[in-house]
Each structure stands twice: as structure tokens, then as C-alpha cells.
Design a protein with these regions (language model features):
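Broad hydrophobic/π-residue packing in well-ordered secondary structure
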Residues: 22, 39-40, 55-56
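Intrinsically disordered, low-complexity, charged/polar segments
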Residues: 48-91
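Beta-strand elements of modular eukaryotic interaction domains
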Residues: 14, 47-48
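Residue-level recognition of conserved beta-strand positions in structured domain cores
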Residues: 26-28, 60
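Extended aliphatic helical segments
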Residues: 15, 25-26, 71, 85
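Mixed-charge, Lys/Arg-rich low-complexity intrinsically disordered regions
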Residues: 1-14, 19-23, 30-33
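Short, solvent-exposed secondary-structure boundary/capping segments
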Residues: 33-42
Length: 91
């Protein structure tokens, strides 16, 4: 059995991406990468995460749209803007 890293963020917390202009609310957490190799390779190499860390499912939004995002812990930080998330799937 692998030793998975404990998740830093919790379900319901609002986080933002460190490099891209979007934020979202955590609705699920994978203890390590659980998506396709193709998806992983689509992430720019400069910020491509390792698989052995928590990955977060987010109800995400930016200034143009809302969507579901799958993001590694290393590329997220807590959002301290106090602005609400207005994603349609929250209501």
C-alpha cells in the first residue's frame, strides 16, 4: 500500500489556481492522480504535477465561464478573496 499525502484542502473550501486565473470550490479529492495519461501530458511541462499527491475536483469559474476542473495540490492555494463562488451546480 502506498503512503498517500494527506490533503491540504477540504471539501467545501474555495481555492484558486497558482498559475491560471480561475478559482473553485472543492467537491471531491483523489489521494493521488486518477485521470488519464493523456490528460496529464496536456498540462504544460513547467507546471506538470507528479502523480503522488492529492488531486482536487473543483466546481471552477473564471471571468468567462464555469466548469469542472481537476487540479493537483501543488498548483492550488487557498482563495482568501472572500468572494462567493457562483457556479450553477452549487444552487
Amino acid at each position: 500500500m502506498k503512503n498517500s499525502k494527506k490533503a491540504t484542502f477540504n471539501i467545501g473550501q474555495i481555492v484558486k489556481h497558482k498559475y491560471y486565473p480561475f478559482r473553485g470550490v472543492v467537491f471531491d479529492i483523489d489521494p493521488e492522480y486518477a485521470n488519464t495519461e493523456e490528460y496529464l501530458m496536456s498540462i504544460p511541462q513547467k507546471i506538470r504535477p507528479t502523480k503522488d499527491q492529492p488531486f482536487y475536483h473543483l466546481l471552477a469559474e473564471n471571468s468567462e465561464t464555469e466548469y469542472i476542473a481537476y487540479v493537483s495540490e501543488q498548483n492550488l492555494e487557498l482563495d482568501d478573496s472572500d468572494e462567493p463562488i457562483t457556479h450553477d451546480e452549487l444552487y
